[in-house]
Amino acid sequence: MKLGIIFAGQGSQKVGMGTDLYEIYPEFRNSFDLLTDEHRRIAFEGTAEEIKATVNAQPILLAFGIGVSKILAKKGIRADYTCGLSLGEYTALTSAGVFSEEEAMAVIQFRANAMAKASEGLDTVMSAVLGLERNLLLSLCKKANEKAKVDIANYNCPGQIVISGTKDGVTELERLAEEAGAKRTMRLSVSGPFHTSYMEPASKALAEKFKEVAFGEMEIPVIFNCIGRERENERIQDLLTAQVCSSVYFDDSIKYMRDKGVTKIIEVGPGKALSGFVKKTCRDIDVISIETAEDIRKVEKWLEK
């Protein structure tokens, strides 16, 4: 049996996340204590609007994911392959030994600020389109771009693709998609046009930041968002720089894991969004998610099967 561990991205954040894990597991508490007092307050008892903000959601989710990965590691649960959705890629890289916790937190805070700055003054949104095939939506995207800017941000799973861009561009593509037979469209709880060309200023800022970052040896194979596979000759920093303004090939990443022999996947949440993507992409993979302390106990029993 080969095990994959995957980490959730922005949009999965929720007020109250990590409360019980913080109380029970010292290794989780150590990770969450790397957050500022204000970030911990927002995570535990803030408002939905506060935790949605990029500069809050990203470090909180990173600390949550790293904390859970340390709980699993202490219990001897180790991935054969790992990946994460957008922000979650940094959590995966940290769990694989590429970044220290402190380095990852510094990079993510920088990334969040750069992405928020790139979003300033833009009237942009993200939306999930359900029930359309990849090539059809790509052609509709080109048509919508005749009126306003919109890009494909995430290929989550067959039948669910996320679009991102100006409010006018996304609205136009939603209209075209529904006319073409999409089951429905759904606006997402994020605060910027992520994984589009609007993020090029953030990408350039990250390229400069990475010049001062120490990259450790990768102890677990990581599947990267912007290529949907392990790296070959590509540098990690180049893949992360490209990631912020490129499409995320999450469905291809899960297929890659399956082709490498992965039969079980643990999603580190909060939430179960990625588990849903896995089930729709590779039905033969068994998947379970972690959000609470009770979920940790469920995972231990699940792995014994």
Which residues make up each language-model segment?
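Short, charged, surface-exposed secondary-structure boundary motifs
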Residues: 296-302
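Non-catalytic positions within long, well-ordered alpha-helices that form the structural scaffold/packing
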Residues: 73, 178, 258-261
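A short, flexible low-complexity segment enriched in Lys/Arg and Gly/Pro that occurs
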Residues: 60-65, 243-250
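FabD-like malonyl-/acyl-CoA
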Residues: 1-136, 142, 188, 264-294
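Alpha/beta catalytic cores of group-transfer enzymes, especially the acyltransferase/condensing modules
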Residues: 10-12, 37-40, 96-246
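A short, acidic, amphipathic alpha-helical segment used as a generic capping/interface helix at domain edges
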Residues: 245-262
